[in-house]
C-alpha cells in the first residue's frame, strides 16, 4: 500500500521515514511521528531513568529500553524494527536492549534513507 496524499504509510515495511542508531532501525508511518521521536527521545530517556531511580538505584544503562518504549508511544500504527539489518520483533529488540545495558553509552538516533535490499544484505554479512 503506497503512502497517502498526506504522506502516511499504513504499512510500516514500506515507509521511507526511518531512524537508526546503527544497530537498531525504527520505521515510522509519518514524518510527524519520525520528527516527534527524534526531537523527544533524549528528554524521554531522562524521564524514564528518573522513573527507574524512584524504584531502585541501578548502574545499568536504560537508554535503549527507554527508546523502545518511546517509539511504541510515538508510533501508533504498529511496530516495525530492524536489528543489525534484519527484521526484529518487539521481543527481540527488548532482549537486545537488556543485553546492552552494561555498555556505558547508547548511540544517538538520526534520520536515514530507507536502505535498499542490496545494502541491507551487505550489512547483515
UniProtKB/Swiss-Prot annotation:
Highest taxon of source: Viruses
Keywords, in A-Z order: Activator, DNA-binding, Early protein, Repressor, Sigma factor, Transcription, Transcription regulation
Molecular function GO labels: DNA binding; DNA-directed RNA polymerase activity; sigma factor activity
DNA-binding region coordinates: 77-96
Cross-referenced InterPro entries: Phi-29-like_sf (IPR038246), Phi-29_GP4 (IPR008771)
Pfam families: Phi-29_GP4 (PF05464)
Gene Ontology biological process terms from the UniProt entry: regulation of DNA-templated transcription
Site label Interaction with host RNA polymerase and activation of the phi29 late A3 promoter, positions: 120
Known outcome of mutating residue 116 to E: No effect on transcription activation from the A3 promoter and on transcription repression from the A2c promoter. No effect on the interaction with host RNAP
Known outcome of mutating residue 117 to A: 60% loss of transcription activation from the A3 promoter and 60% loss of transcription repression from the A2c promoter. Poor interaction with host RNAP
Family, per entry: Belongs to the phi29likevirus late genes activator p4 family.
Quaternary assembly: Interacts with host RNA polymerase (via C-terminus). Interacts with DNA; binds to the A2b, A2c and A3 promoters. Interacts (via C-terminus) with the histone-like protein p6.
Function statement: Mediates, together with protein p6, the early to late transcriptional switch by stabilizing the binding of host RNA polymerase (RNAP) to the late A3 promoter. Activates transcription from the late A3 promoter and represses the main early promoters A2b and A2c by modifying the topology of the sequences encompassing early promoters A2c and A2b and late promoter A3 in a hairpin. Proteins p6 and p4 bind cooperatively to an approximately 200 bp DNA region located between the late A3 and the early A2c promoters.
Protein name: Late genes activator p4
